[in-house]
Amino acid sequence: MKVAVLGAAGGIGQALALLLKTQLPAGSKLSLYDIAPVTPGVAVDLSHIPTAVEIKGFAGEDPTPALVDADVVLISAGVARKPGMDRSDLFNINAGIVRNLMEKVAATCPKALVGIITNPVNTTVAIAAEVMKKAGVYDKNRLFGVTTLDVIRSETFIAELKGLNVADVNINVIGGHSGVTILPLLSQVKGVSFTDEEVAALTKRIQNAGTEVVEAKAGGGSATLSMGQAACRFGLSLVRGLQGEANVVECAYVDGGSEHAQFFAQPILLGKNGVEKVMPYGEVSAFEANARDAMLDTLNADIKLGVEFVK
């Protein structure tokens, strides 16, 4: 099993690489790429950790050597949010980065499962899909927008609010991966009830949690460590699916035939071909139905921006 991380010298990429080095199955290969010259050194640093995961780092303009024979590709390359920016401000820089990297993925490892972390995910996943279509290698079951950070934040905040063991909290987060498009289905959380006020406040906190971190870091960065953990969880789930493990389910932003938008985050069953099945996200409350319907204009505009960027 070979996993490639593109953008591996950044804040998310280094955290993700560390977690993968310690948690990938024995015998796996981990390949790190970044344009920054420090990247081979990041790999050397991580290579001193005693786990049975072989690691190599590549720098420079061309990610191709890192991508050869990759089974899973996780893309975190791009610029991070600064105070006052929202995820869409990142579009101008990150759109081109994702397009260029995906052209190399299409040419080198078109059958790999690709997880897009680079924001704005609502748009960058659409860009990735269009690049793969242009190359004639698009498989909607092998492309994912990584929305796991919204899930782990929801789990954490619910457990804190209700005094629960966080390991017992399971929640679906649907829609997209920015602002109002992030919709935690709080009504479905088992064994707990929320007041209307709690639902409104918790939903807003989950939607704005990225900004909470950006402001707390006072210009010194964005959510890199929690995102690294979220990306590792999702990447390991992709690997477990590829290895034939049963019942591996994660929420992700996929081209899954949703009635709501071309790309939509909801629970998916993972397997040897990536998406084995898009799962129904279940019954929702009136609050959630309204929030879902209200987000669709924003979500569809984000998707359209990505499609048009490639055309």
Curated annotation (Swiss-Prot):
EC assignment: the record states 1.1.1.37
GO molecular-function terms, A-Z:
L-malate dehydrogenase (NAD+) activity
Q: Which GO terms describe its biological process?
A: malate metabolic process; tricarboxylic acid cycle
Disulfide bond positions: none
Q: Which SUPFAM superfamilies match?
A: LDH C-terminal domain-like, NAD(P)-binding Rossmann-fold domains
What is the active site of this protein? 177
Q: Which UniProt keywords apply?
A: NAD, Oxidoreductase, Tricarboxylic acid cycle
- Which CDD domains did the record assign? MDH_glyoxysomal_mitochondrial
What does the entry list under GO cellular component? cytoplasm
Where NAD(+) is bound, by residue?
7-13, 34, 94, 117-119, 227
Pfam families on file:
Ldh_1_C (PF02866), Ldh_1_N (PF00056)
Which stretch is the leader sequence? none
**Can you state which reaction this protein catalyses?**
(S)-malate + NAD(+) = oxaloacetate + NADH + H(+)
Q: Where does substrate bind?
A: 81, 87, 119, 153
Has keyword Lyase?
Answer: no
Q: What top-level class of enzyme does the UniProt entry assign?
A: oxidoreductase
Q: Which NCBIfam families match?
A: MDH_euk_gproteo
| Family under the similarity heading | Belongs to the LDH/MDH superfamily. MDH type 1 family.
The record's function comment reads: Catalyzes the reversible oxidation of malate to oxaloacetate.
* Assembly behavior: Homodimer.
Q: By what name is this protein known?
A: Malate dehydrogenase
